[in-house]
Design a protein with these regions (language model features):
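Periplasmic c-type cytochrome electron-transfer domains
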Residues: 2-87, 93-96, 109-123, 132-152, ...
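Short cysteine/histidine-rich zinc-coordinating motifs and their immediately flanking basic loops
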Residues: 93-99, 182-187, 273-279
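Extended intrinsically disordered, low-complexity coil regions enriched in Ser, Thr, Gly, Ala
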Residues: 94, 100, 190-212, 241, ...
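Cysteine-rich, disulfide-stabilized extracellular repeat modules
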Residues: 102, 127, 168-171, 182, ...
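Extended amphipathic alpha-helical interaction segments
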Residues: 164-180, 239-243, 253-267
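Flexible internal linker/loop segments at domain or repeat junctions
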Residues: 205-209, 217, 226-229, 234-259
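C-terminal functional regions that serve as terminal interaction/effector modules
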Residues: 260-327
Length: 327
């Protein structure tokens, strides 16, 4: 009984002390004095163990040596990450170095982490630091682009990243005219469609951490002009692409009473509804169809219904069909 009373008294004193620290501001939160002895070690050890526990399995890591994926990650890093971690080989600003904890230079930050751990950190961020989570939820697929760039830094093969002070048009060009793969071609899309997508990215109706960051570099009032610049020409577009006969043809023509066929909305160079798909990048089409199928993209109920039951093999078949039929 005496032991229980003693423990209760100690617990009460501890709670009273904690309440006093909080209530009277006894703890100095100044970044100049840093943490108390042992606190930094405890936080860092907890952080490393927490990341290791929750990181994706190694078999979930995609191919990270794809130049297009690396370039896409470099473009996002330039405006979303470099302000704290700096560019490879460049010194951080004095302001950043005065943070507690100070964000490590990027080469140091990635040196002791594997790709799965880097993915978890970029996607989730870290409490009690300046490291934010990915701007939108359920877009782990986009995070791999940044991880690919970080892995290239570790290997000493990172490409030069775009200058963060590029204007909106130049920054768009750094991805949409220089990178293939999962980045869509804009020159086959209409200006109205592009403007609507920019607005959807701005409001979050179409979730994308990369594009949510990118549209902040463009004044909202210039969306129309930007869309007009990158869109398909209004005249001289050439003949309508003829759908190729092959495994994807029957699938693209397949529809129901409630869900029209792919070609009903996306056929030809000037589709009646939806963006043109003929000639679009295959990897981009596959990634977007997967997002629709998995319920990440929901802003168009018809597309959500059309893709809901697609298998991974059917997504690959359709993506290959539309990409090759338009070229």
């Amino acid at each position: 009984m005496r032991v229980l009373i003693t423990l209760a008294v100690l617990i009460g004193l501890g709670l009273a002390g904690a309440a006093a620290v909080v209530s009277f501001g006894l703890y100095n939160v100044s970044a100049r004095v840093g943490h108390l002895p042992g606190v930094a070690w405890g936080l860092h050890t907890t952080f490393r163990n927490s990341v290791s526990l929750r990181a994706p399995a190694p078999e979930e890591v995609p191919r990270l040596d794809d130049p297009d994926l690396i370039a896409l990650g470099a473009a996002h890093y330039a405006t979303g990450c470099a302000m704290c971690h700096g560019a490879p080989g460049e010194e951080q600003t004095p302001t950043v170095r005065a943070m507690v904890p100070a964000p490590p230079p990027i080469a140091e930050a990635v040196a002791h982490w594997g790709a799965p751990e880097l993915h978890w950190i970029v996607e989730n961020g870290a409490k009690m630091t300046g490291m934010p989570a990915w701007p939108v939820e359920n877009r782990a697929d986009e995070v791999w682009a940044v991880v690919a760039y970080l892995e290239a830094i570790k290997g000493g093969t990172a490409p030069e990243m775009p200058s963060p002070d590029l204007d909106g048009r130049a920054y768009c060009q750094s991805c949409h005219e220089d990178i293939g793969g999962r980045v869509p071609r804009l020159d086959i899309l209409s200006a109205d469609y592009l403007e609507a997508q920019l607005e959807a990215y701005r409001t979050g109706a179409r979730p994308s951490g990369i594009m949510a960051q990118a549209v902040t570099l463009v004044p909202e009032g210039s969306f129309a002009a930007l869309a007009e610049y990158f869109s398909a020409p209004s005249t001289g577009a050439g003949a309508e692409p003829v759908p190729q006969e092959g495994p994807g043809t029957a699938l693209a023509r397949q529809g129901t009473r409630d869900v029209p066929a792919c070609l009903a909305c996306h056929g030809g160079q000037t589709p009646r509804k939806g963006p043109r798909l003929f000639g679009q990048n295959e990897a981009y089409l596959a990634a977007q169809l997967t997002l629709w199928r998995d319920g990440t993209l929901t802003h168009d109920p018809l597309m959500a219904a059309a893709s809901r039951d697609l298998t991974t093999e059917e997504i690959e078949t359709l993506s290959r069909y539309f990409a090759r039929a338009g070229r």
